[in-house]
Amino acid sequence: MKEHRAPWECTYAKEDKNKCKAGKKPKSDQEYFEILCLCILQAGLSWGMVRKNWQKYRKGFSNFNISKLAKMQPKELMKSPNVIKNPKKIEGIIYNAKEFQKIKKEYGSFPNFLKSLKQLKDKEVFKILMKRFKHVGEYTAEFYPHCVGYW
């Protein structure tokens, strides 16, 4: 079993959580946010392509700076040559940056938000993540907690 940070290092999370240790816990809200964005951007694409271009995407998305992205408009990001040109994913990332800001106000930090979910059953956690964040479906709602060491 391998402990990892980047989701592309483990493709077993959905099939069998026992094949791969949960990812390392991020050190900041921004790292939690970046990993959520990574899961969103990767959906429907190959991990290899995303991994190969990740530094370019980081640049295009202002290093996933929550404050900067929360203030941006989708049209601004669509102009960047360094982003995946999917309007729904871009809108989702901007919305989710604003949601991370709300979570920080409500809970003090994203890890505190996740701790508040610990007493819930997995399926309830997935539903909360899908409801709270845009462009987070069932697979991402299951995969993301694994990637950030929630399990």
Language model features: what each stretch is:
Residues 1-84:
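N-terminal polyanion-binding entry modules of DNA glycosylases/AP lyases
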Residues 43-49, 100-108, 149-151:
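Short helix-capping/linker segments at secondary-structure and domain boundaries
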Residues 55-56, 98, 118, 146-149:
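Short amphipathic alpha-helical surface patches that mediate protein-protein
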Residues 60-132:
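Alpha-helical ds-nucleic-acid-binding substructure associated with the helix-hairpin-helix region
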Residues 125-134, 143-151:
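Phosphate-backbone recognition surface of nucleic-acid-processing proteins
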